[in-house]
Structure formats: structure tokens, C-alpha cells
Design a protein with these regions (language model features):
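Gly/Ser/Thr-rich loops at beta-strand to alpha-helix junctions
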Residues: 246-251, 333-334
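Extended C-terminal subregions enriched in glycine
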Residues: 324-346, 350-360
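Gly/Ser/Thr-rich loop/hinge elements
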Residues: 249-324, 366-367, 371-373, 386-389, ...
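Cysteine-dependent hydrolase recognition
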Residues: 284-285, 293-310, 333, 357-358, ...
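Active-site rim recognition segments
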Residues: 384-417
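Amphipathic coiled-coil/heptad-repeat helices and related helical stalk/stem segments
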Residues: 221-225, 311, 336-337
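A short pocket-lining beta-strand/turn micro-motif at the edge of beta-sheets
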Residues: 348-349, 377-381
């Protein structure tokens, strides 16, 4: 048995156990279960005849692609670089094109060389997630890390481009493409305070983006949210809509910021079965232990036989005047946003309005492992979720509304019928509460 077969057996058996309850739903593009004995035998036959890591990575990538809903994939172990050449590059039709650039004139242009090296050869400098087309290796989406300027050739045209931080580049693209480019948007709509948060990412939390509030310039989301909270308290405001539609999650550090709009402490303690915990521990631990040091720390913690993880989510008392919070959610909410939605339903922190989330909030996310061959190619196997993104793990809103198919920049515009419905719901509840008080 060669080393490629041995290592593939580790990956295959591990994924087969991990995804046991999902196997009947995981079909390849040819409607063949990639975990079937036929699929396994076919791959082993290929592996028995290969002689290079590149051939091995090609087969592994093909196997991951057969899990075509993104349940597992190969990825570079390297962290995101501090600085990049500010271009998003994509491979299509056997060529590389600029998809996004601060300089819009470069978009949709074909890149032929970088620093005088043909693009096909230049990508060989990268270790990471490769794909294959007719035997040719390529990277689907390419970002060029660099601390210094690069000369980019577009056919006969050459341009020297200076690097910038990836965070600044992302911000420039968002600002250009989105009229509501700030991560946080605050407004008073028909008498109801409206707070929109586009992303819960750690990067956005640490950003230095500028906000304008009543003529004053404010730097960063923490200061901005604090100014908004003080404004609402000073006006004794009791109702607030928090819109997280389209927010795909990020860091639960944002929960501490939402405490600014809380009138008391809210806590939810829960226990969640991990993917590993759902399986037979005898079989699963045999697979895990077989991986030895190849398996990373985040997975090793599950080896002790504990079938669940104890978790706690809380939002502190911010002494806010806000008594009634309304959380707008939709099917573009994942991860931490789903956690916040579940938390709101469980504790009453907010009344959820909209359509169901896409789940994956109260689960183990994500984890990964590597093997000797993947490690020497600076790659790892990433499993982005617990594979239980099913209806029972989605969050249903307390009040359902018809979901609009909106682009991110269309939220809170005249096209946003969901928000219009939410405003009417909040106004009706506010009027009902005022009437109840007047009758007391």
C-alpha cells in the first residue's frame, strides 16, 4: 500500500464517519454516492498508479468536489496576508481575469503575466487550494499576497500596482459597490429607530471606517454604536429594529456591543451535540486516534468521549431605555447570526421578524485536519460545518413575513418590502402598548 492510498484512507474513513447521517443526501454530480464502495474502489485504483503529490492533490480535489455542497474542501493553511495586490482574480475559460479592483478600468481584463512571469507559471509559487481542468492545474480565485509593488501585464499593457491591506481593499470595494457601504447604518424610518449591521466579522469590528452622526465624524463601529445608544437613551426611545438580514456571521464579540441596547441581562445556557458526538464513539475514536498528530487541536478536544459541548450566550444589562427590540432575519443568516436569532427566541431579547435562517448557529464550526502529504503541500482539509444544516436546525422567526429577493445594497431602500412590513408591525405594537397604558 503506497503512502497516497494510506493517507486517502484516513481522509475517506474520517469523512464517512463524520458525515454518516448525511451520506444518503450527499450525491456527486453524477448522482453517485461518493462514499459508496464503488466510488472508493475507483479512487483507490487511481491512487495505486500515481507517482507525485500533484496527482494526489488532483484526486483529492476531485473527491472534495463530489461533496458538491461545500461540506469539505482543500485549503491553504496560510493565514490571510497582511497586504495584497488589490485585485480579485478569477479563473474562467482557461484564462485569469480581474473580477474586482479599486481601479475599475482593470476589471474584466485578462492577466497574462506578473513580474514578467506567465500567469500559469506564477501560480506555481502558491501552495494551497488547486483545481484541475483537462490535466491543467489552476486556482479558481486568486489573491496575490505581497509587501511590495507588482508589475501586472494585461496583454501588451503593463501596470505597476502597489499593495494595500486586504481589509482596506475589501472596504474600498464595498464602499464603491454599495451606496450603504458602511458596516453599520442608522436611521429613523417613519418614527422608528432602525439599526442595520451588515457583517459581524472580526475585521469589521476592528475597522477604522468613518461614520457621520448629526454632523460629527466618528471612527470605528464601537464608538459609533455607543453614540447611537446614548442618543436613543437621551430621547427615552423604547423601540429599536436591528436588521441583520444578509449578515453571514463572524465573531460573537458583537454580542457585547448589542448590550448597549439592552435593558437587562439575557442569558441562555445550552448543550449541543457535536458532529463527532452524534456517532458511535467506538468507531469514531478509532478513526480519530488513527490520525494521531495529524488531527488538529480543535478536533482533539472531542476525543474524551464527551458527546456534547456546554455553551453559554449572554448579553449584559446596558441600562438602555430600549424595551422592545425587533431582529430582522432571513435565509442569508448563518453562524453567529443564527445563534443570535435562536438566542432572541429563547430569551426574549428581541422579537424575530422575517424568514427562517440557514442554521448552523448552535454547532461546532469549523474544524480541519491535515496529513503528511497535505502538510508538505501547505494544505489542510476544511470541514466548514457540522453537516446538519437542515430545517430542524434553522431558526424560524416569531413573526413571519414574505422574503424579498434583494441585493445587499437594496436593504432599507424603497424596494425593501420586508422592512416596510416590519415597520408596520412595530408601529402597531407600539400603538397597542400605548393604548394599554392609557386604559390602566
Amino acid at each position: 500500500m503506497n503512502e497516497y492510498v494510506r493517507e486517502f484512507n484516513k481522509i475517506f474513513n474520517y469523512l464517512k464517519v463524520t458525515m454518516k447521517n448525511y451520506n444518503d443526501k450527499v450525491l456527486s454530480n453524477n448522482n453517485v454516492n461518493p462514499f459508496s464502495s464503488e466510488s472508493y474502489d475507483r479512487i483507490i485504483t487511481k491512487l495505486s498508479n500515481i507517482k507525485s503529490d500533484q496527482e494526489y492533490l488532483k484526486i483529492i480535489d476531485s473527491f472534495m468536489t463530489s461533496l458538491h455542497e461545500g461540506h469539505a474542501y482543500l485549503s491553504s493553511k496560510s493565514d490571510e496576508p497582511d497586504k495584497i495586490i488589490p485585485l480579485y482574480i478569477q479563473y474562467k475559460d482557461s484564462k485569469y481575469y480581474v473580477i474586482k479592483a479599486v481601479n475599475q478600468e482593470l476589471e474584466n481584463k485578462e492577466i497574462t503575466m506578473i513580474d514578467g512571469i506567465k500567469i500559469d507559471k506564477y501560480i506555481l509559487n502558491f501552495k494551497g487550494s488547486y483545481s484541475f481542468e483537462n490535466g491543467k492545474m489552476f486556482i479558481k480565485n486568486l489573491i496575490i499576497p505581497s509587501e511590495s509593488a507588482k508589475t501586472i501585464s494585461f496583454g501588451d499593457e503593463e501596470i505597476t500596482i502597489e499593495p494595500m491591506s486586504s481589509q482596506d481593499f475589501n472596504h474600498e470595494i464595498i464602499k464603491r459597490d454599495n451606496p450603504y457601504f458602511n458596516n453599520i447604518v442608522f436611521n429613523i424610518i417613519d418614527g422608528i429607530p432602525y439599526l442595520r449591521i451588515n457583517s459581524f466579522s472580526h475585521e469589521m469590528l476592528a475597522s477604522k471606517e468613518k461614520y457621520n452622526f448629526l454632523g460629527s465624524e466618528i471612527t470605528g463601529p464601537i464608538e459609533y454604536l455607543n453614540v447611537i445608544a446614548n442618543y436613543l437613551n437621551s430621547n427615552n426611545v423604547s423601540d429599536l429594529i436591528i436588521d441583520i438580514r444578509g449578515n453571514k456571521g463572524g465573531s460573537d464579540e458583537w454580542f457585547s456591543l448589542l448590550s448597549m441596547f439592552s435593558d437587562k441581562e439575557y442569558t441562555h445556557n445550552y448543550s449541543v451535540d457535536s458532529t463527532i458526538g452524534r456517532q458511535s464513539y467506538g468507531e469514531t475514536n478509532e478513526i480519530i486516534n488513527g490520525l494521531g498528530e495529524d488531527i488538529n487541536t480543535s478536533l482533539k478536544r472531542l476525543q474524551d468521549g464527551t458527546s456534547s459541548l456546554d455553551c453559554s450566550v449572554f448579553i449584559e444589562n446596558g441600562n438602555s431605555t430600549i424595551k422592545n427590540r425587533y431582529l430582522l432575519i432571513n435565509s442569508d443568516n448563518y453562524s453567529v447570526c443564527d445563534t443570535l436569532s435562536k438566542f432572541s427566541n429563547k430569551t426574549g431579547f428581541a422579537t424575530t421578524i422575517g424568514s427562517h435562517t440557514s442554521g448552523d448557529g448552535f454547532g461546532v464550526t469549523p474544524y480541519s485536519f491535515t496529513t503528511d502529504i497535505l502538510r508538505r503541500n501547505d494544505a489542510k482539509l476544511v470541514i466548514p460545518s457540522t453537516f446538519y444544516n437542515l430545517e430542524e436546525f434553522q431558526t424560524e422567526p416569531s413573526i413571519k413575513t414574505k422574503e424579498d429577493l434583494l441585493m445587499s445594497y437594496e436593504y432599507a431602500t424603497y424596494k425593501d418590502n420586508e422592512l416596510k412590513q416590519a415597520i408596520e408591525i412595530v408601529k402597531a405594537r407600539k400603538l397597542e402598548q400605548e393604548n394599554n397604558i392609557s386604559f390602566q
